[in-house]
Amino acid sequence: MADTQQFANLNERTGCTLDKFADRGYIDFMKRSLHQKRILLTGASSGIGAALAPLLAQEGADLVLLARRKERLHNIAEQIQQRFSNRKVILVDGDITDAEVRHRAVQSAVEQLGGLDILINNAGAGATARVEDSTQETLRRMFEVNFFALVELTQLALPYLKQGTEPMVVNLSSIVGLRGVPHYGVYGAAKFAVAGLSEAMRAEVSKYGIDVLVVCPGTTQTEFFDVLHQSTSAPVLPNHRAVTSEYVAARIIWAMKRGKHKIIPAFSAAFLDRLNRFCPRFVDWLMTKYA
């Protein structure tokens, strides 16, 4: 208690927060335990979602996993239950843009897990194309998957989250949802919408005790570039500098447990975000070199 008071006094004198000391390992503040939490995770069959699911089970959570690829979903569930046999894993296969699938996912949590504590909106789709080359189908698909489905699933989940234990919404945005990057204009616009929605919603649901975390990864070693909805230009963000899905997943777990509001889980992406805040003209010039 004396140590905490000492840090509080230091906070008053310097403006440093206790979280800054916690981030450096001096204090280990854990705001939320994930043990026995009932979690709905979308996009669970690959990439960050596939890496996140077993980590959540390891923390002691019960899961509803939603994804399009049924076989992959079953493989992930089998791996989880082999390692954590006491954890419940409910599978919902289908397209996140389908209203019936979203309803089925939320009801699976309510009926089979007894409620919902955490929603992780991880499902997404990508595209790399200049704005002028982006098709109408790409425009609509990027917002249907990355934004509209996320909002509508969150709306379905909120009444149950309000009754949950230490409730939380985790939204996956992107570094291109914080800074516009050439060839990611349409995809980035959808991710900007996710980041903005997360900030607004955080204020709106705080009175119910619901936290909102927005995650803004940089280039990550996933199938993103292999399954692009449209690809008419070379990716500006090089894949050889990507962080692993497992790293991003571990950072998400860390942020969830500590009640963070936003994380950028990659040094290069975090550097770009800071550079853009302090030297926006320079970043504008830099981006023209890739346009």
What are the functions of these language-model segments?
Residues R38, S45-S46:
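Conserved glycine-rich cofactor-binding loop
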Residues E59-I76:
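Conserved glycine-rich Rossmann-like NAD(P)H-binding loop of the short-chain dehydrogenase/reductase
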Residues R130-V131, T135-R140:
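Substrate-binding pocket helix/loop in short-chain dehydrogenase/reductase
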Residues E132, R179-G185:
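Active-site loop immediately N-terminal to the catalytic Tyr-X3-Lys motif
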Residues T154, A190:
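Active-site helix of classical SDR
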Residues S174:
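Residue(s) in the substrate-gating loop at a strand-loop-helix junction
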Residues K207-F267, W285:
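SDR active-site lid
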